[in-house]
UniProtKB/Swiss-Prot annotation:
Belongs to the LCL2 family. Keywords: Signal. It comes from Sordaria macrospora (strain ATCC MYA-333 / DSM 997 / K(L3346) / K-hell). The gene is LCL2. GO terms for biological process: ERAD pathway. Residues 32-60 are annotated as: Disordered. CDD domains: LCL2-like. This is Long chronological lifespan protein 2. Probable component of the endoplasmic reticulum-associated degradation (ERAD) pathway. Residues 1-19 form the signal peptide. The keyword Ubl conjugation does not apply. Transmembrane segments: none annotated. Residues 43-53 have a biased composition (Low complexity).
Length: 133
């Protein structure tokens, strides 16, 4: 009876471990516990309507082409390609997640809110500028 309890306990504990680390071993060893068929299985899924898109290349030419096509007779913001009157008017690329802080001489920075309340990032930048942080 004790052996049966021990065996059932081991099986119960092993299933979450297999679920957690199974894909790790599949990726590291090419399908490890599946007789080496993990790669073939992945290729089969790709053929059934689940197309995987390639990663964006590490090549600035896509950005440069968009920059060259953008028409602006004022100031073209380099990070958002927005056309504004002055550089410090440039919007942040992710305004729902960043606070815009205007610095001296028409410069601005976009700072991640990081879970802080509205205006907290700007307050910390101002404290740092004053040497208090």
């Amino acid at each position: 009876m004790r052996t049966l309890t021990l065996l059932l306990s081991l099986l119960f504990l092993a299933s979450p471990i297999a679920a957690q680390f199974g894909s790790f071993f599949d990726q590291m060893f090419g399908g490890g516990g599946h007789g080496g068929h993990g790669h073939q299985h992945q290729q089969q899924h790709q053929g059934h309507g689940q197309q995987q898109h390639p990663n964006v290349p590490s090549d600035p030419s896509i950005y440069q082409a968009n920059y060259q096509r953008a028409h602006c007779d004022k100031y073209l913001c380099p990070d958002t390609l927005a056309c504004v009157h002055y550089p410090h008017h440039c919007p942040c690329p992710w305004p729902s997640h960043e606070d815009k802080v205007e610095l001296a001489e028409g410069q601005r920075v976009c700072v991640s809110r990081g879970g802080f309340k509205a205006g907290e990032a700007a307050r910390k930048i101002e404290l740092a500028r004053q040497g208090l942080l």
